[in-house]
Amino acid sequence: LEQEPLPSMARRAADRVLPSVVRVEGEMARPAPPRAAPRIRPQPGGEELDGSSLGVGTGVVVVDSGLILTNLHVIEGAREVRVTFHTGLESPADIVSLHPDQDLAVLKARRLPDDLQAATLRSSADLGPGDQVVAIGFPFGIGPSVSAGVVSGLEREFRSPKHGRPLARLIQFDAAANPGNSGGPLVTADGEVVGIVTAILNPTSAHTFLGIGFAVPIDSAAAAVGIPPF
C-alpha cells in the first residue's frame, strides 16, 4: 500500500503560516430586546453578551509590529475588537484603516507575543489554475482549521448578497471555507500568503461551502497596509 510521505504539502504550508494567523472577534452592538421579552438561551457555538453579539473571523499578521489584515465585514459595526494570537495571547485591537472597495480592514494589536512572526507574502501574479493552495481560519469559530485545494480561476468578480459591495480581480479556490474563515490567509504550498479569504458563493439560503471560494489577491491587500508593490 503506497502512501504519501508525511508531512504532507498542506501540513508544511500550515506549519509555516500558523504562527501568523489570529482569531478576530468583534463585539457588535445590537438593539436591546423589549423589557417584557423572555430571555433566550444562547445556541451552541454562540455567545450571549449584554446588548451585543460576537462576530468571529480570522486575520493574518503581515507586519511584525502587530499590523493585521482581515475583512471589513468581520469587524464592521463592532464597538470593540480583540484578537487571539497563535500563542493564546489575547489583545484588544485598534482599527487602523478600512478599505470597503476590497472588503479589507487593517488592525493593530495593543499587546504582542514576544516571538510574533509576520507571514511571508508572495505576489499572486504567477498564480494559475490548478496551483495548490491552503486556507486557514476559524470556520464557525472552530480553529485554527486547515483545508487544502487548488486555484480554480483568476480575475473573478463577486457581489456580496449581504453588503452589496462589488469585488473584482478575485482568486477563486476550492479549499473548504465557511463563515469564520473570512480574513484568513490563502497560502501556497510553501506557506506564502497570496490572498485574503473573503467570500464563498452559495446560491441557496445556507451559508455553507459548495466548492467556490474567493480571495482578495495579496498584491491588492498589501497596498492597504502600505507595503510596497511586489
How does the language model describe each region?
Residues 1-48, 52-54, 58, 67, ...:
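N-terminal activation segment of mature serine protease catalytic domains
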Residues 7, 11, 60, 89, ...:
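Alpha-helical membrane and juxtamembrane elements of multi-pass inner-membrane transport
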Residues 19-24, 59, 66, 70, ...:
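Terminal peptide-recognition signature
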Residues 28-30, 87-89, 190:
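Solvent-exposed strand-loop boundary residues in beta-sheet-rich modules
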Residues 43, 48, 63, 85, ...:
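Acidic surface patches and DE-rich sequence motifs
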Residues 53, 78-81, 115-116, 136-149, ...:
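Active-site loop architecture of trypsin-fold serine endopeptidases
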Residues 56, 63-144, 221-222, 229-230:
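Conserved active-site neighborhood of the chymotrypsin/trypsin-like protease fold
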